[in-house]
Regions:
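Chalcogenol-based redox active-site neighborhoods
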Residues: 20-178
Length: 178
């Protein structure tokens, strides 16, 4: 693990936090930022690949962690409903393709996981990478947010400060899906 002197870490956190001041704040009705990322098999996947379909993009911190596993499994439990309603589910984290493959295999996840490596440029475009606090420490990390993109490529709904274990249920209730 790479270690930096504390003054370097503080500088990086302050510098990256200032960069957030210049990030675009997305809102409902905005065009969803286009992206191309690699999936668990190193295939390039673009948002535009799903033009004409609704897409759920959920950003999560890390594969195989308690909250992220609950969130992924909640999407898996509701997979049939999303399929029946022609909705694509994309999970995005900074984990690499090999980590995603293991996570998918371990929990038999039926949807696509994409890797957004540091500096997490796609997550930053979606206001989903920034300063976090945990146990009194500040660090830069993936922020758990979910976006519903309509069939025209516009942001239909934004879910921030989500409860990981019931995120998919929440979307299904909002859209009145069955």
């Amino acid at each position: 693990m790479l270690r930096f002197p504390s003054y370097t870490t503080k500088f990086l956190v302050v510098y990256l936090d200032r960069l957030q001041l210049f990030s675009m704040v997305l809102k409902i009705g905005d065009k969803a930022p286009e992206f191309t990322l690699k999936d668990s098999f190193d295939n390039e996947i673009s948002l535009s690949d799903f033009k004409g379909k609704k897409v759920i993009i959920y950003f999560y911190p890390k594969d195989n962690t308690p909250g992220c596993t609950k969130e992924a499994c909640n999407f898996k439990e509701n997979w049939d409903i999303f399929q029946k309603n022609n909705i694509i589910v994309l999970g995005i984290s900074k984990d690499n393709s090999a980590s995603h493959q293991k996570f998918i295999e371990k929990f038999d996840l039926p949807f696509i996981l994409l890797t957004d490596p540091l500096p997490c440029q796609v997550a930053a475009k979606y206001d989903s990478y920034g300063l976090k606090k945990f146990m009194g420490k500040e660090y830069m990390g993936m922020i758990r947010n979910t976006f519903l993109i309509d069939s025209e490529g516009n942001i239909e709904k934004i879910y921030s400060k989500v409860k990981a274990a019931i995120m998919a249920d929440h979307i299904i209730n909002d859209l009145r899906l069955s």
